[in-house]
């Protein structure tokens, strides 16, 4: 007897001798049959030993590895029997149940496997069910059919978060009804999950017959309420479901409801296009079958297409019920006069003036214009329009202006004037135009636009005195504007009331600081031919003191002095202009007037002043003109000195200046003066190139980020000495 047998005999209730015995024969030459006998002895001796049964079952299952479960069904059945035998006493051991299920899944025994799954779930505690169910789910996925459905139902009880996966699996297996039920449960639990709704609706759309609780119609209707932004696609899905189920009239009702209740053009377009396609298919079917109903359906389809622009208008008006623009678009759709009038009536009744989006007055005006050929009705509408409590005075003014213009165009100018006059009459003249607590009707008499039109109207059809009274009323109401000043002054001028005209200009100047210069300009132009010199001088001095940088005032003042023969006074004015407005244009104008009155030579002091005052770029330009002027006068040395002096303002990149100097030296210079020119040019070039500040500033000027380079920031006046000319007793030294 072997030692293992002795150990077992000495310790019959101990599992360890059996384990050692079994381990010793695992890798020796003992046959499988002999090993099985040993395992049988062991589990018979200790039937409750999990270790022994686990070793035995692993060994017997391993013997089936690679064997075809159909050809060797007997061998598989014997192993199955062993599992059953072990579970009699070890039914609380989840590992054995799981191992048994995995072994069964290798065999074509669907019913047996389902039975074992149920037994495992009954035998094991609830905490162990998920392990069994995961394995069962693999089995269900493998076999499919009702078995898979039932397993999924059991599985999601343990894993409720896997319901969406269950729905996907059921859809793949073709169980649309069961999948829809799962999706409905998910939607009821999760609320507004649009992805699930889309999945459910698509599922319904793919199923010709689907009985659900709640019904499909109710489900999709619920989706429309939950997801109003998807109203269009969901409505089409519902209608298509009804069509597939043969309920065409109900589908048509759904389409009609969809196009008449859509809140966006996008939803409307989706539903309308599907509706039209649905009707076209019906018409095609009826025509192919020569049905007598074909003509009726064609007529209904045509009517549907004709309704489209009106239905779109309905959609827009549902979104913007107080939009004047949308109501105008709606009215434009009608061709029948009666329908147009009805639309206008509906529009003005539907828009509360305080909530109007846009100018409600334009709606009333266009309605009145609709009756342009019926003066009595048009005037009645205009009158009603003037009673509407508009949000702004401007809208009420639009109505009065349109009404008056209508009467004027129809040669009823007296009525045109009367309409505006009545609008502008008010017992309370002290109200504020901007007081929104008052109605537009209470403030209309302060409308500048209406007064302006009234003044033009009275001027066209009334007398001078009547027009004058209008302007005086405007002034009394403190409604004067710069335009009123100019118009009133022009009216007085045309009727030879010059002193009153001057007073109007002066009042405008005192009231409008921002526009005072323009008014001064007109005032001085009008006053120059009519007032004495001393008074005019006072006016000009006053204007210039207020606007010292306005070149036009100096030019006008200087011209006055010249016209009166006081040329030297004019020159003083031009000199003052150059003191206050330091630009090349002002100096050129001053130089031009000096040349005309005193000749070229007299311009030297002006040029000197310009070179002292102007920034580099302008100084360079004037220096060139100055030198060329001296050249014309034959003053060659003076011209050369000016070229040299002006070079400090002139970047050598300014080709014009140095080209002129070059030509001058070629024409009048010597070799020495030419060399001096080149030396100065090189010196200036070096100065401009090495001045870092200049280089940086020039780059920024090129980009437009800073002002241009000005004299005094780089090369200072006098830094470069003019070239020394040849000894000449007539040489003139410039003190510039």
Swiss-Prot record:
In Pfam terms, one family for this protein is: HAT_Syf1_M
By its UniProt entry, which InterPro entries does this protein fall under?
HAT, HAT_Syf1-like_N, HAT_Syf1_central, HAT_Syf1_CNRKL1_C, Syf1-like, TPR-like_helical_dom_sf
Question: Which coarse location class applies to the principal site listed for this UniProt protein?
Answer: nucleus
What is the disulfide pattern of this chain?
A: none
HAT repeat start-end pairs: 1-27, 30-62, 74-106, 130-161, 246-281, 339-373, 377-409, 428-460, 462-494, 496-529, 531-563, 598-632, 634-667
Keywords in alphabetical order, please. mRNA processing, mRNA splicing, Nucleus, Repeat, Spliceosome
SUPFAM superfamilies, per this entry?
TPR-like (SSF48452)
Q: Which portions of this protein are annotated as coiled-coil regions?
A: none
Provide the protein's localization: Nucleus
BP terms from Gene Ontology: generation of catalytic spliceosome for first transesterification step; mRNA splicing, via spliceosome
Top-level taxon of origin = Eukaryota
Q: Name one GO cellular component term.
A: post-mRNA release spliceosomal complex
Q: Subunit structure, per the record?
A: Associated with the spliceosome.
Family statement? Belongs to the crooked-neck family.
Q: What does this protein do?
A: Involved in pre-mRNA splicing and cell cycle progression.
Q: State the protein's name.
A: Pre-mRNA-splicing factor SYF1
């Amino acid at each position: 007897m072997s030692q293992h047998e002795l150990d077992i005999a000495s310790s019959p209730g101990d599992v360890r001798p059996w384990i050692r015995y079994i381990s010793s024969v695992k890798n020796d030459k003992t046959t499988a049959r002999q090993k099985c006998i040993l395992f049988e002895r062991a589990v018979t001796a200790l039937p409750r030993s999990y270790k022994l049964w686990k070793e035995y079952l692993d060994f017997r299952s391993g013997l089936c590895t690679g064997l075809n479960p159909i050809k060797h069904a007997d061998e598989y059945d014997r192993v199955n029997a062993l599992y059953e035998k072990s579970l009699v006493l070890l039914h609380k051991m989840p590992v054995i149940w799981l191992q048994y299920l995995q072994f069964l899944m290798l065999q074509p025994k669907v019913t047996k496997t389902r039975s074992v799954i149920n037994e495992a779930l009954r035998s094991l505690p609830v905490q162990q069910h998920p392990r069994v169910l995961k394995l069962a789910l693999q089995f269900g996925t493998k076999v499919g059919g009702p078995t898979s459905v039932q397993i999924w139902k059991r599985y999601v009880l343990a894993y409720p978060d896997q319901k969406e996966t269950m729905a996907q699996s059921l859809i793949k297996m073709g169980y649309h009804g069961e999948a829809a039920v799962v999706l409905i449960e998910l939607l009821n639990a999760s609320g507004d999950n649009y992805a699930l709704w889309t999945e459910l609706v698509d599922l319904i759309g793919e199923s010709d017959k689907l009985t659900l609780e709640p019904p499909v119609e109710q489900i999709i209707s619920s989706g429309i309420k939950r997801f109003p932004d998807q109203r269009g696609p969901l409505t089409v899905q519902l209608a298509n479901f009804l069509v597939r189920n043969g309920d065409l009239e109900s589908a048509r009702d759904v389409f009609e409801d969809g196009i008449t209740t859509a809140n966006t053009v996008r939803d409307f377009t989706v539903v309308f296009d599907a509706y039209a396609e649905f009707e076209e298919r019906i018409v095609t079917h009826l025509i192919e079958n020569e049905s007598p109903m074909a003509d009726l359906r064609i007529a209904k389809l045509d009517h549907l297409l004709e309704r489209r622009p009106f239905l779109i208008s309905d959609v827009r008006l549902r979104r913007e019920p107080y939009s004047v623009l949308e109501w105008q678009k709606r009215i434009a759709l009608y061709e029948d006069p009666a329908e147009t009038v009805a639309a206008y009536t509906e529009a003005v009744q539907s828009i509360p003036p305080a909530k109007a989006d846009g100018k409600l007055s334009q709606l009333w005006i266009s309605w009145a214009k609709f009756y342009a050929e019926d003066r009595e009705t048009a005037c009645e509408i205009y009158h009603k329009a003037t009673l509407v409590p508009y949000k702004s005075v401007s809208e009420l003014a639009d109505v009065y202006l349109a009404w008056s213009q209508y009467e004027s165009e129809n040669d009823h100018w007296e009525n045109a004037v009367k309409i505006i006059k009545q609008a502008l009459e008010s017992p309370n003249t002290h109200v504020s135009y901007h007081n929104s607590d008052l109605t537009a009707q209470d403030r209309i008499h302060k409308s500048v636009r209406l007064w302006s039109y009234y003044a033009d109207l009275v001027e066209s059809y009334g007398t001078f005195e009547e027009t004058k009274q209008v302007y005086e009323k405007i002034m009394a109401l403190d409604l004067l504007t710069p335009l009123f000043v100019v118009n009133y002054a022009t009216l007085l001028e045309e009727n030879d009331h010059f002193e009153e005209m001057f007073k109007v200009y002066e009042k405008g100047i005192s009231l409008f600081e921002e526009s005072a210069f323009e008014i001064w300009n007109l005032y001085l132009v009008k006053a120059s031919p009519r007032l004495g010199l001393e008074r005019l001088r006072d006016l000009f001095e006053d204007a210039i003191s207020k606007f010292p940088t306005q070149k036009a005032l100096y030019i006008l003042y200087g011209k006055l002095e010249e016209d009166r023969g006081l040329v030297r006074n004019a020159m003083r004015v031009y000199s003052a202009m150059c003191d206050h407005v330091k630009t090349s244009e002002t100096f050129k104008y001053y130089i031009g007037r000096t040349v005309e009155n005193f000749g070229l030579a007299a311009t030297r002091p002006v040029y000197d002043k310009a070179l002292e005052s102007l920034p580099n770029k302008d100084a360079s330009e004037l220096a060139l003109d100055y030198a060329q002027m001296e050249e014309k006068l034959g003053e060659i040395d003076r011209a050369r000195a000016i070229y040299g002096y002006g070079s400090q303002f002139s970047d050598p990149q300014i080709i014009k200046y140095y080209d002129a100097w070059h030509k001058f030296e070629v024409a009048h210079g010597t070799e020495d003066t030419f060399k001096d020119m080149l030396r100065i040019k090189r010196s200036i070039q070096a100065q401009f190139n090495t001045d870092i500040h200049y280089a940086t500033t020039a780059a920024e000027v090129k980009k437009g980020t800073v002002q241009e380079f000005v004299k005094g920031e780089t090369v200072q006046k006098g830094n470069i000495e003019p070239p020394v000319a040849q000894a000449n007793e007539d040489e003139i030294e410039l003190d510039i």
